Curated annotation (Swiss-Prot):
This is Bidirectional sugar transporter SWEET2. Mediates both low-affinity uptake and efflux of sugar across the plasma membrane. GO terms for molecular function: sugar transmembrane transporter activity. It is found in: Cell membrane. Residues 1-15, 72-76, 130-137, 192-194 are extracellular. Glycans are attached at residue 7. Residues 37-50, 98-108, 159-170, 216-236 are cytoplasmic. Pfam families: MtN3_slv. The lineage of its organism: Eukaryota, Viridiplantae, Streptophyta, Embryophyta, Tracheophyta. InterPro entries: SWEET, SWEET_rpt.
Length: 236
């Protein structure tokens, strides 16, 4: 009875962490909306790049496939979050293609085809693996690698913040959402004993803490600089 109660509690904690992760991830998925409102208003993609949305779609589709019962077990929350994420990214890509120039249209359509082709190869290839454990390792490593590279992308922004001593290019709520989502899925992976979930999200959690710490440090410094009286005051 004690073992049953423990397993039930573990399952409940996993579900709570997964639901929280889905909620925080939704905040990330809607974050590009102001950019696309501007694109639609100006009927131009200007200098914006569509590559982040292509890569995000690829990442969501790989992780979605990993979450299915064909690959792993008890990962329904991974399926929901990545289904929603893939839908958002696909909508962003379609809007980008509609409002960009002809050259970029062809480029984005080509990349979109590559994404679906790569995912198709991964799905078809993994289904050819008869052993469930080997299949889990194969797709798990791909999913883990994809997530790690996605979480590593803010390293450029972190370097920029340190170099410029400004948090202008690192929005607080985006960093907070990333940290909360990563921390939630870190717990989800731990409760589910899934190394391919808790490892990349553990890295994401650490990077999220670094971003928030840098934001607090440099934001406080910028406020102090603004409120500091100048040594020489001139009156005109």
């Amino acid at each position: 009875m004690d073992v049953f109660a423990f397993n039930a509690s573990l399952s409940m904690c996993k579900d709570v962490a997964g639901i929280a992760g889905n909620i925080f991830a939704f905040g990330l998925f809607v974050s590009p909306m102001p950019t696309f409102r501007r694109i639609m208003r100006n009927k131009s993609t200007e200098q914006f790049s569509g590559l982040p949305y292509i890569y995000a779609l690829l990442n969501c589709l790989i992780c979605l496939w990993y979450g299915t019962p064909f690959i792993s077990h008890s990962n329904a929350m991974l399926m929901t979050v990545n289904s929603v994420g893939a839908t958002f990214q696909l909508c962003y890509i379609i809007l980008f293609i509609m409002h960009t120039d002809k050259k970029n249209k062809m480029k984005m359509l080509g990349l979109l085809f590559v994404v679906f082709a790569v995912v198709g190869v991964i799905v078809a290839g993994s289904l050819q693996i008869p052993d469930q454990l080997t299949r889990w390792y194969f797709v798990g490593f791909l999913s883990c690698g994809s997530l790690v590279s996605m979480f590593a992308s803010p390293l450029f922004v972190i370097n920029l913040v340190i170099r410029t001593k400004s948090v202008e290019f690192m929005p607080f709520y985006l960093s907070l959402s990333t940290f909360l989502m990563s921390a939630s899925f870190l717990l989800y992976g731990l409760f589910n004993s899934d190394a391919f979930v808790y490892t990349p999200n553990g890295i994401g959690t650490i990077l999220g803490i670094v971003q928030l710490a840098l934001y607090c440090y440099y934001h406080r410094n910028s406020i102090e600089e603004e409120t500091k009286e100048p040594l020489i005051v001139s009156y005109v």
